[in-house]
Amino acid sequence: MLNIAVLVSGGGTNLQALLDSEARGENPNGRITLVVASKPGVYALERAAKAGVEGCVVRRKDYPNSEEFDAALLDTLKNHHIDLVVLAGFLSVLGPSVIAAYPRRILNVHPALIPSFCGPGMYGLRPHEAALARGCKVTGATVHFVNEECDGGPILLQKAVDILPGDTPEVLQKRVMEQAEWKLLPKAVAMVCSGEIA
């Protein structure tokens, strides 16, 4: 049984998808034991509390540099015996020490079909705005392992989502979450926990 930490920065809709999947018994080889937020007061912490999962806050601005932030985050993960880290809308960049401590054990969900609309600055509505501005007919989501390159780790799963006439970035974001992110992320986590993906 792998202990899973989910790192969040906002409302936690992907966290909720993971919690719901776990409650349905879809990941018998892993359990979410910790939710780490990058700032206090985010709704994701309420979701964690409602599910009986411990939540804590590790804020980048509380540390003088990224190395000390990474050390604090790593201490938090190690103290909770975390085996697998899932980035679910976590907006702080993980440093080399965290990535090195969890090789092929950090997953991220990205709201586009990597290698399109990814990399530094491509988060939130921006990938959807970029897909619409480019005139794309499809977009989607990607779950990948995290390495030192932003959105550059090995891809585990992808799912395409149609872009429809009249879509706004907000409408497209909601469709990508519902049709791709909330399905792919729990599936990828279960596959890693079962050893199907190593």
Question: Language-model segments: which ranges?
Answer:
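N-terminal Rossmann-like dinucleotide-binding module
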Residues: M1-Y43
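Short, surface-exposed acidic-centric catalytic microdomains
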Residues: P28-E68
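Short acidic active-site motifs
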Residues: Y43, A72-L73, L94
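Charged helix-capping and loop-helix junction motifs
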Residues: E68-L74, Y123-P127
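Glycine-rich phosphate-binding loop signature in dinucleotide/nucleotide-binding domains
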Residues: T76-D83
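Donor/substrate-binding cores of folate-linked one-carbon enzymes
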Residues: L84, A88-I197
